[in-house]
């Protein structure tokens, strides 16, 4: 979709609003530090890495599950581990419809890492920081870039399913819709495109993109922006009426963190509408092409975007708490 010149200022306006929001929380973000636990739990990164690696060796879904959980957590209430809270009434953040598909392996990864950390540094390291470290570690385990993680987040005291609605990008969004959501969290267009590259690993239920394969429009049953051969592959893969049927988001290298996601977009093989829109829209197309042609440029942008994501809505200082159990408030 090309954005008309009359509308071109709207995404830019959202970026400026997002940057304003980001500057408003800069003071609290400044309290994050790469060596935050240098004196209180100096081995925290090694402890988390060992726990994550052990879990990853048990199942490769650990990587996409943990990375996706970090994204979902940060976009609702900020990066504060609010997505881990369990509620008997099933009204916590994790119970929202948009979070019900979060894989159990993501929860298990952080819980096991938290247990390992608590055995060495009881009551010191937040679940939010452990999730941030685990998200970095799984990226490295599947071949992605290694980057420094800022620490010092506190765990949140609020977790409500009702606050999730509208906070997470849907697979049917266009670039304008994506920009609005990311900018509301202080993230730029480049951040959004780079973070979308996390779709190079993981899978999706067929119902999340079925509208592109069947009854797309009155005259076109299949989305015309999708490569026809790829469309037939998906139709065949999703022929099973089982609602739990899944396909890999990146059919070329599902378990490797690389830039093939962007190469697929250039070839019109993006799984979600929101994926393919990144190439179809002129405001994001050039960046997609750069990332498709240069893996190192993508890795650099992704590393920067992950650090920016990790600063969203953080609780620091006297805000929040250090949970003893990630699934329950103290």
UniProtKB/Swiss-Prot annotation:
Binding sites annotated in the UniProt record for heme b: 199
Residues where Ca(2+) 1 binds: 73, 76, 78, 80, 82
Keyword annotations of the record: Calcium, Disulfide bond, Glycoprotein, Heme, Hydrogen peroxide, Iron, Metal-binding, Oxidoreductase, Peroxidase, Secreted, Signal
Residues bearing attached sugar chains per UniProt: 215
Signal sequence, start to end: 1-30
Protein name (database record): Peroxidase 55
Pfam assignment, any one: peroxidase
Cofactor (UniProt): heme b; Ca(2+)
Domain of life where this protein originates: Eukaryota
Role of this protein: Removal of H(2)O(2), oxidation of toxic reductants, biosynthesis and degradation of lignin, suberization, auxin catabolism, response to environmental stresses such as wounding, pathogen attack and oxidative stress. These functions might be dependent on each isozyme/isoform in each plant tissue.
GO biological process, one term: hydrogen peroxide catabolic process
GO annotations of cellular component type: extracellular region
CDD domains referenced in this protein's UniProt entry, alphabetically: secretory_peroxidase (cd00693)
Misc remark: There are 73 peroxidase genes in A.thaliana.
Reported induction: By methyl jasmonate, a plant defense-related signaling molecule.
Native organism: Arabidopsis thaliana (Mouse-ear cress)
Keyword Glycoprotein set for record: yes
């Amino acid at each position: 979709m090309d954005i008309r010149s009359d509308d071109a200022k709207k995404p830019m306006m959202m970026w400026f609003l997002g940057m304003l929001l980001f500057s408003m929380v800069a003071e609290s973000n400044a309290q994050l530090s790469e060596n935050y636990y240098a004196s209180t739990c100096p081995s925290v990164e090694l402890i988390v890495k060992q726990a994550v690696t052990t879990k990853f060796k048990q199942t490769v879904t650990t990587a996409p599950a943990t990375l996706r959980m970090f994204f979902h957590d940060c976009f609702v209430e900020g990066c504060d581990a609010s997505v881990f809270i369990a509620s008997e009434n099933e009204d916590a953040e994790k119970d929202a419809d948009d979070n019900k598909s979060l894989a159990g392996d993501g929860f298990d990864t952080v819980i096991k890492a938290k247990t390992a950390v608590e055995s060495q540094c009881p009551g010191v390291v937040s679940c939010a920081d452990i999730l941030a470290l685990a998200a970095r570690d799984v990226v490295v385990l599947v071949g992605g870039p290694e980057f420094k993680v800022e620490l010092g987040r506190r765990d949140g005291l609020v977790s409500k399913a009702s606050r999730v609605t509208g906070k997470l990008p849907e697979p049917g969004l266009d670039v304008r819709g994506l920009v609005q959501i990311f900018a509301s969290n202080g993230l730029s267009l480049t951040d959004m495109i780079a973070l979308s590259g996390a779709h190079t690993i993981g899978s999706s239920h067929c119902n999340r993109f079925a509208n592109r394969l069947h009854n797309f429009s009155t005259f076109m049953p299949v989305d015309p922006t999708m490569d026809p051969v790829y469309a037939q592959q998906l139709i065949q893969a999703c022929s099973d009426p089982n609602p739990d049927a899944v396909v890999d988001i990146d059919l070329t290298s599902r378990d490797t963190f690389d830039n093939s996601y962007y190469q697929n977009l250039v070839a019109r093989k993006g799984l979600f509408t929101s994926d393919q829109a990144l190439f179809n829209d002129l405001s994001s197309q050039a960046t997609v092409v750069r990332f498709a042609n240069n893996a190192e440029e993508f890795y650099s942008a992704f590393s920067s975007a992950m650090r920016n994501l990790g600063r969203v809505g953080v609780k620091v200082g006297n805000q929040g708490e250090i949970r003893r159990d990630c699934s329950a408030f103290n």
